């Protein structure tokens, strides 16, 4: 079982043993305060021999860590900065930060669904610091509609939001980070 935990680290508590994954991959750039291009790839020890880096390099065939440690020519800055981002999370009351971000994301969902007259139907166990909110049906229904609206919001309003088409309507992916507050929602 491969778990794509893209936005989990720093957004929700992650317990790899409880998940029961054979492999786990995730980003660290959004919620764990690491630079872009930094992420993690974890494998159960018994599966590490089956996982190989796509770039053949000096470590090829020398084991899991050697194959993934150095590959081609790359800038290691993001890897070196990642521990600092994780240390920042440890300095804060991590549970309080998660509760704040989750609460603010749900508040954003309530504000938007009230304004758009749509409904937010997310089970409590699937709520996090990022939620997906349905736009009104007349906002569009296609990927092209999503692209046009996203660019219009960015250029005309200075708002960056991920929009996508699904099930015949547009949806907005809204994130609440520790540095956001309610004024960012109503802006």
Where are these regions (language model features)?
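Active-site PLP attachment segment
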Residues: 19-59
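Structural signature of PLP-dependent enzymes
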Residues: 66-110
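Structural detector of well-ordered beta-strand residues that form the stable sheet scaffold
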Residues: 2-4, 25, 52, 121, ...
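Conserved PLP-binding catalytic core of the aspartate aminotransferase-like
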Residues: 99-106, 115-156
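Catalytic PLP-binding core of fold-type I/II PLP enzymes
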Residues: 1-22
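The feature captures the short pre-catalytic strand/loop hairpin that immediately precedes
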Residues: 54-70
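PLP-dependent enzyme catalytic core of the Aspartate aminotransferase-like
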Residues: 141-145, 155-187
């Amino acid at each position: 079982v491969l778990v794509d935990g893209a936005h989990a680290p720093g957004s929700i508590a992650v317990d790899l043993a409880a998940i029961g994954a054979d492999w786990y991959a995730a980003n660290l750039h959004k919620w764990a305060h690491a630079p872009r291009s930094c992420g993690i790839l974890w494998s159960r020890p018994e599966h590490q021999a089956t996982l190989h880096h796509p770039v053949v390099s000096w470590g090829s065939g020398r084991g899991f860590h050697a194959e993934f440690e150095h590959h081609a020519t790359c800038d290691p800055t993001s890897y070196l900065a990642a521990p600092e981002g994780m240390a920042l999370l440890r300095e804060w009351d991590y549970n309080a930060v998660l509760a704040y971000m989750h609460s603010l994301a749900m508040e954003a969902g309530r504000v938007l669904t009230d304004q758009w007259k749509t409904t937010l139907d997310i089970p409590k166990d699937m709520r996090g610091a990022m939620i997906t909110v349905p736009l009104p049906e007349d906002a569009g229904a296609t990927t092209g509609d999503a692209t046009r609206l996203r660019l219009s919001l960015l250029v005309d309003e200075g708002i960056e939001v991920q929009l996508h088409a699904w099930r015949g309507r547009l949806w907005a992916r809204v994130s609440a980070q520790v540095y956001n507050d309610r004024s960012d929602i109503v802006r």
